[in-house]
Amino acid sequence: MTNLEVMGKAARQAAFELSQLSAGDKNYALQMIAEQLESQQQQILAANARDIDEARINGLNDAIIDRLLLTPERLRGIANDVRHVISLADPVGKLIDGGILDSGLKLERIRVPVGVIGTIYEARPNVTIDVASLCLKTGNAVILRGGKETRHSNRILVEVVQNALEKAGLPKTAVQAITDPDRALVMELLKLDRYVDMIIPRGGAGLHALCKQHATIPVIIGGIGVCHTFVEQSADQNRAISVIKNAKTQRPSTCNTLETLLIQESIAHEFLPKLAAELPVKYYADKTAYSILHHAGAEVLAVTEDDLRKEWLCTNLNVVIVQDIEAAVAHIREYGSQHSEAILTESLQLARRFVAQVDSAAVYVNASTRFTDGGQFGLGAEVAVSTQKLHARGPMGLEALTTYKWVATGDYTVRS
């Protein structure tokens, strides 16, 4: 039987111990984790294969199975992400700002760990290691609750991490997992505010809504990517197509994948047939785009209101024709999830206008939305992509897992 009260208390104590460690101590533990991931590859992949088999038996779709899948290459990538975290500067103890006050007090604002973090995620076994490594680097303890789809993978990954922690002389309770699939435990975790300081969900809209509705702990909302790219009439069309192909097809199951393509009306008849020839996906198009794409021989269906709000997580692509940049921004404001949006244009003035008017965590000029990623941003393995404005926004790396404290030093100073 899982006792979250016991887990929370142990995590709180582990967080205190982690907060006192040097960067070298934490990096040594991370090195042990990376080595254990590689030395235990066979066992990890065998456990993951069980999850994949069960997912197929249960009829899960290809997008979920892709997120669930671990391969030797992906596992090596996860281990290398841990090593990259080692190479990053430790933000804990960093001076943010400070100065001498009129009272004579020396006032400093320094970065400190958040404390205990709860992470709830679905078919993403890589999150187990990503979150554990970032939390350890920043001196935070973590309680993980993965989806039932990943139970075999998560169990062995947490064992690997805990064994590495013990080898490094650190409390294994710094990284704990809820392995019981009982959903009541999720609700209990969301209300464990006596011990847990922050909840980070990683999954679909339903999971985020559940956490937001029931948590008595601050929740980081994000990761739902209804991402747009607007092709403005001055764009280099051939180069624009290469960006669109990358944004849509490189890895369709990710949250930074392009879901809706906005085309300026003045170039639609010229551009869309070129796109259809280069990008053979299933299109969901508005009336005018449907006619053009159908005539070009593309596989196309009529787009619906629900489609425009959908995170496809596959190669389906919405196409909407807009009159100008004003209409493009209005569409994004109505249907976007404040994740990642892009404009393809040769106009610096319009690019600046797009950046100023689009209120998303990441806004791109002449680049793919696929770059919204902690590794690509140089942050290391991300814990999440936040689409809210507090406490963090965009890919959440190390600094997003810290808070700060004010430290005032005086000479027996009293307030007058």
Swiss-Prot record:
Pathway: Amino-acid biosynthesis; L-proline biosynthesis; L-glutamate 5-semialdehyde from L-glutamate: step 2/2
GO molecular function annotation: glutamate-5-semialdehyde dehydrogenase activity; NADP binding
Disulfide partners: none
Top-level class of the enzyme under EC nomenclature: oxidoreductase
Gene Ontology biological-process annotations: L-proline biosynthetic process
InterPro entries: Ald_DH/histidinol_DH, Ald_DH_C, Ald_DH_N, Aldehyde_DH_dom, G-glutamylP_reductase_CS, Glu-5-SA_DH, GPR_dom
Catalysed reactions listed for this entry: L-glutamate 5-semialdehyde + phosphate + NADP(+) = L-glutamyl 5-phosphate + NADPH + H(+)
Source organism, top-level taxon: Bacteria
Keywords: Amino-acid biosynthesis, Cytoplasm, NADP, Oxidoreductase, Proline biosynthesis
Entry-linked HAMAP family: ProA (MF_00412)
Function field: Catalyzes the NADPH-dependent reduction of L-glutamate 5-phosphate into L-glutamate 5-semialdehyde and phosphate. The product spontaneously undergoes cyclization to form 1-pyrroline-5-carboxylate.
NCBIfam families: PRK00197.1, proA
Family: Belongs to the gamma-glutamyl phosphate reductase family.
Full protein name: Gamma-glutamyl phosphate reductase
Source organism of the structure: Actinobacillus succinogenes (strain ATCC 55618 / DSM 22257 / CCUG 43843 / 130Z)
